[in-house]
Amino acid sequence: MNQAPDEYDVVVLGAGPVGENLADRTRAAGLSTVIVERELVGGECSYWACVPSKSLLRPVLARAEARRVPGLRQAVDGPLSAAEVFAHRDKQVGNWTDGGALTWLESAGIDLVRGHGRLAGPQRVAVTPPDGSDGDERVLTARHAVAVCTGTRAALPDLPGIAEARPWTSREATSSATVPERLVVVGGGVVAAEMATAWNGLGSRVTVLVRGSGLLTRIEPFAGELVAETLREAGVEIRTGTSVKGVARPGGAAGPVTVTLENGERLEADEVLFATGRTPHTEDLGLETVGLEPGGWLTVDETCRVRDVPGGWLYAAGDVNHRALLTHQGKYQARIAGAAIGARAQDVPLLETDRWGAHATTADEAAVPQVVFTDPEVAAVGLTAEQAEAEGRSIRVVDYDMGQVEGAVLYGDGYRGRARMVVDLDRGHPIGVTFVGPGVAELLHSATVAVAGEVPIERLWHAVPSFPTVSEVWLRLLEAYRG
């Protein structure tokens, strides 16, 4: 027998970083809030993506940087201890338990219902037990809003034999407790580049198969070129213009994988990772009960309210709305959406939805920051030169060799990197900045502030970088721009 409906002001589907942030904002607005989660509180990022992947990458990148420092390289000449790296990774993900996250939820006054949540009509969510048993269904009713924060899952291509071959997705690649002797990585994006870096550093013989022309093609072209150059020097084989037509594991679970290419060539590996994109977790959310198509991305307005839903009670934040598939950007959307839900619940007559307003996700279009944790690191925000030109903007592009900055010279021998600033000539401020080089991740927020703040070039001239730091690249870019 079903329980009587439970009423909350806000029901959130998905307890990843996006759902947690949205719930935190609605609680801050004084709204009762419950999160529904079928797996671990903390979500994909905490257990199978951002946190474990960077835990694997940190020792690999630290060793690479140490090897460039005179007097230190001999001390780090040996192989990494995979066992210690895995133990550190496991600690960072709480050994795939969510006790710490539960403590935070309780402290924030957010309720949790474990199970699979599906929409059951306007402002109603039906929750079935997480183990898939035939236990009682629980129905939650939202007085003001339901927020879908269910994220995405790995998208596997429709290839013969792929299901039986049990390939790695990003989940297996970040949680494996053994180092495959041979690893084939299919894809050329961020996950492919990072996992090729990590597993090569841990001792795998890695082959990367890229259907397109190179790595990281959504960023400035020189980024992927520099990353590929270093990977090849480290022994990674990168094949571009290469497509896979089949995969098989004929020997069973413990046997090798055979990857068949379009040209008929066969590659044998111990594991194959498909890093070929993401698909939204919307196929079993009951979207059809509110007039939406299951399985697709949810289209939202600037407040993350789902379009074409009568009553305006349904929101979608994070990867599921396809605006910017990055954890930090999803958390940003969650803060905006949570504030909008709170304002509407309080009958605020006019929300601040103008550009850069309190209830507008403007940064999704103008200032999305991203770091790729490879060697060298890639850090970018805003538009590339190609994207700016496609929008019809009048721009000027300024490039600088980061290896010429004194801070980079001191950072390590043979520092290789490049910086680019894209300036909107009509507005007089940067609309895109890209850094490639060891340690540039920590430079990115300065660029994000410049782009999101629309800081004029003439004002940036007065932002003096400390000497001798790598951040002096800002001065070099501005000098090149001013002439």
Where are these regions (language model features)?
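Rossmann-like dinucleotide-binding cores of NAD(P)H-dependent redox enzymes
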Residues: 86, 91-98, 174-175, 180-184, ...
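Beta1/beta-strand and adjacent pyrophosphate-binding region of the FAD-binding site
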Residues: 2-16, 179-189
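Short hydrophobic core segments
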Residues: 11-13, 117, 140-151, 185-186, ...
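Flexible, glycine-rich terminal cap/loop adjacent to redox cofactors
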Residues: 13-39, 51, 55-62, 368, ...
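FAD-site-proximal beta/loop scaffold in flavoenzymes
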Residues: 163-179, 266-357
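N-terminal Rossmann-like dinucleotide/flavin-binding domain of flavoprotein oxidoreductases
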Residues: 2-8, 45-139, 219-245, 385-387, ...
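A Rossmann-like FAD-binding core segment of flavoenzymes
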Residues: 75-76, 111-114, 118-133, 202-302, ...
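Glycine-rich FAD pyrophosphate-binding loop
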Residues: 27-45, 204-215
